[in-house]
Amino acid sequence: MDFPTISRSPSGPPAMDLEGPRDILVPSEDLTPDSQWDPMPGGPGSLSRMELDESSLQELVQQFEALPGDLVGPSPGGAPCPLHIATGHGLASQEIADAHGLLSAEAGRDDLLGLLHCEECPPSQTGPEEPLEPAPRLLQPPEDPDEDSDSPEWVEGASAEQEGSRSSSSSPEPWLETVPLVTPEEPPAGAQSPETLASYPAPQEVPGPCDHEDLLDGVIFGARYLGSTQLVSERNPPTSTRMAQAREAMDRVKAPDGETQPMTEVDLFVSTKRIKVLTADSQEAMMDHALHTISYTADIGCVLVLMARRRLARRPAPQDHGRRLYKMLCHVFYAEDAQLIAQAIGQAFAAAYSQFLRESGIDPSQVGVHPSPGACHLHNGDLDHFSNSDNCREVHLEKRRGEGLGVALVESGWGSLLPTAVIANLLHGGPAERSGALSIGDRLTAINGTSLVGLPLAACQAAVRETKSQTSVTLSIVHCPPVTTAIIHRPHAREQLGFCVEDGIICSLLRGGIAERGGIRVGHRIIEINGQSVVATPHARIIELLTEAYGEVHIKTMPAATYRLLTGQEQPVYL
C-alpha cells in the first residue's frame, strides 16, 4: 500500500532505534507543561517541532481519513512516517498487549483523529510503571428488577465456572462491577482444551422417562391447570420444608373434596432450558420459567406442584441480610401421570447439568470424586439430644411400697448410639406419670446408680421390677422425643442407602453406611419421608419414595414397639 509523502522540516522525524528495548516509551524526566511530545534537551527533534501550519495539518488529517481502517507497516528499508509513529506501526514489533491508549496499536482511528485535532496536550507523568487498575464497567440490569438473575442451580459448587459469571442472588446488585481491561489468556483452573474435550466419552443418557434428544428440543405433557399461589421462603430450605410448602400450595388452590374444581386444559413444555405452560388449544404461553429458576417439584398423588423462585423487590434490613427471602410462585396441576412429569423435570435438570460440565471444560467423570468441605457434615437426631447436657437429668420418684413405677419399656434399636431401654408408655396415675418429669421416648440409662446401658431388654425390665419394694427410686434419663429425625446425605439416586425395609419397618442396616451415620436404626418404623407421611402407605410406595429420594433425605422414625403401643395394636405391660 502506498502512503502519501508528507513534507517535513530539515530536522526530520525523531531518530528511533528500531532494535531498542521493547518496553513502553518512557517520557522525559523533565516535566514541562508545553507538550508530552517534547524531546530531551539537545535531542534531534520531535513531532511537536514539525513546521506544519494549520492548512498543512488539516491536509494531513484529510489524508489520514482517506486511508483504510487497517494500516500496514512500511517497508523495512524506509523510514517511518509520523502516522506510523503515532499509531505504533512504524516501530519494531513490541509487546504492548497490556498497554491501552492512543499510543497502542489497538487505538482506533477516531482516537488518533482526536489527537491530531487537539491543540494542547497535558504533560506526561513520570514514575515507575504500576499495574493497571481495574476499570469500571457498567452492566445492563435485567429488564425485570424483580426477576431472579441467579446463575443456574447446576452451576453452584462446580469446580470450574464460566469466566465472568457471577451469582447476584446472595447480595444486592451493584450493577457497576470492576473488570480488568485485558482479558487473561490463561484458561481457568480445571478448564480443558477442545482437544481434551474431544477425548471425553460421549455424555451418558440421564436416567428418566424421556429421551435425551427429546429433552433438548422439549417434551410436552398434558395436564389440567388448577391455579397458582405465592409463598415466601428462604433460598435453600431443607427438603422437608419444600414438601410442606408444596402441600400448603396444594391446599390453597385445590378445592375441597366434593366441591367443583375450576381447571383449564394445558400442555406442560419441559426442556433443558425452560418450562412453559401452554394453552391446549392455541399453544399460547401462559407461563414461562427458565429451568434454573425452578426450585422444587412435588407430585402428591395426581397433583403436581411446580415451584419457581423470584426475588422480592424490597431490600432486606441489615440484620436480615443473611436471610434473604424469596417469592415462591407455586403452580398447581392435575395430571394422571404427575409422577412421570416430575421425573421428566428432574431428568431435564440432570441433562442440563451434564451439558454445562462439558461446555465448561470439566471432565464429567471427575465430578463428585473430591467431596466438598461440607459433605462430611452429618446430622444425627440422637446425637443432638445426647450431646445436650440439659437433656441429661435425674428423676426422683416417690411411691408406695409394693407399687411399680408404671412404665412400659422397649428396646432402643440395633445400632443406636445409646443402646438402652426406651420408655414407650406411662401408666395413667402411676408414679412415673405423677412425677411429671418423664415422657414417652426418654432413654433410661440407670436406676439408683446402676447403669442399664448395653443390657438386653429383659435385664432392664428385671432391674425395674426390683424397685417395687422401695419407696424412693432415682432414675437417670436422657430426654428424647418419641420420633427421631434421621438426615441422610445421598449425592445421587444411584448410591445405596444401606438399609432394608419390610412393611415400613427397618429390618437390616449396613454397618458404617450413610443410613446408620444419619441415624437410621433397626427395629424402627418409618413415619415420614421428606415431609410425606407413610403411616398408612403401602410397602411398594415406601420403597418407591426411598429409591427416588436423594440429596438431603429426611426420614422420621420411632421404635416399632412404641408405634404399636401408641396405636393400640398391642397392650402395654407396665412395670
Curated annotation (Swiss-Prot):
Specify where the region named Disordered lies, as residue ranges. 1-50, 118-211
Organism this protein belongs to = Homo sapiens (Human)
What is recorded about the protein's domains? Composed of an N-terminal domain, a middle phosphotyrosine-binding domain (PID/PTB) that mediates binding with the cytoplasmic domain of the amyloid-beta precursor protein, and two C-terminal PDZ domains thought to attach proteins to the plasma membrane.
Keyword Hydrolase appears in the UniProt entry: no
Compositionally biased tracts (Low complexity) = 156-184
Coiled-coil stretches: none
PANTHER family from the entry? Answer: AMYLOID-BETA A4 PRECURSOR PROTEIN-BINDING FAMILY A MEMBER 3 (PTHR12345:SF9), SYNTENIN RELATED (PTHR12345)
What highest taxon heads this organism's lineage? Answer: Eukaryota
User: What lineage does the source organism belong to?
Assistant: Eukaryota, Metazoa, Chordata, Craniata, Vertebrata
Matches recorded under PROSITE patterns: PDZ, PID
Descriptive protein name: Amyloid-beta A4 precursor protein-binding family A member 3
Question: What is the stated purpose of this protein?
Answer: May modulate processing of the amyloid-beta precursor protein (APP) and hence formation of APP-beta. May enhance the activity of HIF1A in macrophages by inhibiting the activity of HIF1AN.
